[in-house]
């Protein structure tokens, strides 16, 4: 069933990005009249937007106490602690981070923290699989050599590596690309704090 506008005024509802003029109208209206019933506020302010659109624009972007800028390491740690405690209850978490919106925290979690967790799980799975294969190969090698064979088992361990580290070549963007895909020590320490290590 298609939704059809009940009157000609509903057909004029504007969608898409907000203009600076619309932002100023909404800010001034709320400054003079306060927040109220959002559907009537949109019409009273002269905005051709839905009440929901006005409410979300105000709460997520225009409110004076909305904090701008990157999430700090302290905020990140708090988000991780509260998420471990409450899960995806973003509004409840946002109440403990003044000036941050639930939507901003959710987006931060999904784009930064959750991404790193999935990468770490993938890397741990690959490392465990690799270690298991190495162990199986070492056992097979020792068994095929037999107990009376005088050859020395040459399995790799970090302390036995004698390669030249100076031969490593990195491109000009190595550090910036690596920082986007790797965890900092603060990230690792904060994860250990959550795990009780």
Curated annotation (Swiss-Prot):
Gene Ontology biological process: circadian rhythm; floral organ senescence; green leaf volatile biosynthetic process; regulation of cell wall organization or biogenesis; regulation of DNA-templated transcription; regulation of flower development; regulation of gene expression; regulation of phenylpropanoid metabolic process
Keywords carried by this UniProt record: Activator, DNA-binding, Flowering, Nucleus, Repeat, Transcription, Transcription regulation
Keyword check for Kinase: no
Molecular-function annotations in GO: DNA-binding transcription factor activity; sequence-specific DNA binding; transcription cis-regulatory region binding
Tissue: Specifically expressed in flowers, mostly in stigmas, petal tubes and petal limbs, and, to a lower extent, in anthers and stamen. Also present at low levels in roots, stems, leaves and sepals.
Compartment(s) where it occurs, according to its Swiss-Prot or TrEMBL record: Nucleus
Feature: compositional bias, Polar residues: 138-158
Induction statement: Circadian-regulation with peak levels occurring in the early morning hours and lowest levels during the late afternoon hours in flowers.
Pfam families associated with the record: Myb_DNA-binding (PF00249)
Effect of inactivating the gene: Impaired expression of ODO1, EOBI and several biosynthetic floral scent-related genes (e.g. IGS, PAL2 and CFAT) leading to reduced scent production in flowers (e.g. phenylpropanoid volatiles including benzaldehyde, phenylethyl alcohol, benzylbenzoate and isoeugenol). Impaired anthesis enter and premature senescence of flowers. Altered cell wall modifier transcript levels in flowers.
Residue ranges flagged as DNA-binding region: 38-62, 90-113
This protein's record includes keyword Transferase: no
Region (Disordered): 125-158
CDD domains registered for this protein in UniProt: SANT (cd00167)
SUPFAM superfamilies per record: Homeodomain-like
Residue intervals of the HTH myb-type domain: 10-62, 63-117
Coiled-coil ranges (or none): none
GO cellular component terms, A-Z: nucleus; plant-type cell wall
Function: MYB-type transcription factor controlling the production of volatile organic compounds (VOCs), including floral volatile benzenoids and phenylpropanoids (FVBP), in flowers of fragrant cultivars (e.g. cv. Mitchell and cv. V26) by regulating the expression of ODO1 and EOBI, key regulators of the shikimate pathway, and of several biosynthetic floral scent-related genes including IGS, PAL2 and CFAT. This scent, mostly produced in the evening and night by the petals, attracts the pollinators (e.g. the night-active hawkmoth pollinator Manduca sexta).
Protein name as annotated: MYB-like transcription factor EOBII
Lineage: Eukaryota, Viridiplantae, Streptophyta, Embryophyta, Tracheophyta
Gene giving rise to this polypeptide: EOBII
